């Protein structure tokens, strides 16, 4: 499981000209599911994101989590995080999970994130989406449940 996590002052996702998800200050999470990912990967990823200390404390240190600051989360499913560009010019997505599996795990991740008491907005699974954001910092992290990076 892979995620790109960005600290934002605001973010939104639009499908067919309609805003389907919008947040204020918090985290934009681009969320990818790989072949073979399990509930253990999901639990690790959601726990990691919910607890990441990416927000400044009173001394200006990144010492507070999205939970600590009452931030929001916009989660957008993105299979292209599994694009392999090592050969040729066109990425291969062979290591991305099939849509049925990815959709189920994405919905479970959203539910688990909401279980932390966080306000979570989402995009639309498998839709063409436009994501707008104002990156704060900028703070952008790559997270992989296999701990590849």
Swiss-Prot record:
Question: Which Pfam families would you find in this protein's record?
Answer: Tyr_Deacylase (PF02580)
List the ranges annotated as motif Gly-cisPro motif, important for rejection of L-amino acids.
137-138
Q: What is this protein called?
A: D-aminoacyl-tRNA deacylase
Give the top-rank taxon of the lineage listed in the UniProt record for this protein: Bacteria
UniProt KW Hydrolase keyword: yes
Hydrolase as a keyword? yes
The organism that produces this protein has a lineage beginning with: Bacteria, Bacillati, Bacillota, Clostridia, Eubacteriales
What keywords appear on the UniProt entry? Cytoplasm, Hydrolase, RNA-binding, tRNA-binding
Q: Cite the EC number.
A: 3.1.1.96
Cellular component per GO, a single term: cytoplasm
Please tell me the species this chain comes from.
Desulfitobacterium hafniense (strain Y51)
Its subcellular locations are:
Cytoplasm
Q: Which InterPro entries match?
A: Daa-tRNA_deacyls_DTD, DTD-like_sf
Assigned protein family: Belongs to the DTD family.
Q: What GO molecular functions are on record for this protein?
A: D-tyrosyl-tRNA(Tyr) deacylase activity; Gly-tRNA(Ala) deacylase activity; Ser(Gly)-tRNA(Ala) hydrolase activity; tRNA binding
- Residue spans crossing the bilayer: none
């Amino acid at each position: 499981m892979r995620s790109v996590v960005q600290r934002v002052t605001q973010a939104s996702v639009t499908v067919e000209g309609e805003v389907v998800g919008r947040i204020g200050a918090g985290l934009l999470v681009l969320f990818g599911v790989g072949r073979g990912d399990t509930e253990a990967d999901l639990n690790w990823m959601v726990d990691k994101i919910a607890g990441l200390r990416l927000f400044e404390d009173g001394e200006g240190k990144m010492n507070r989590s999205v939970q600590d600051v009452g931030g929001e989360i916009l989660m957008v499913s993105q299979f292209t995080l599994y694009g392999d560009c090592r050969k040729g010019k066109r990425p291969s997505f062979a290591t991305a999970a099939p849509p049925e599996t990815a959709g189920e795990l994405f919905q479970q991740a959203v539910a688990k994130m909401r279980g932390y008491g966080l306000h979570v907005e989402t995009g639309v699974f498998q839709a063409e989406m436009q994501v707008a954001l104002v990156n704060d910092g900028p703070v952008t992290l790559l997270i992989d449940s296999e701990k590849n990076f």
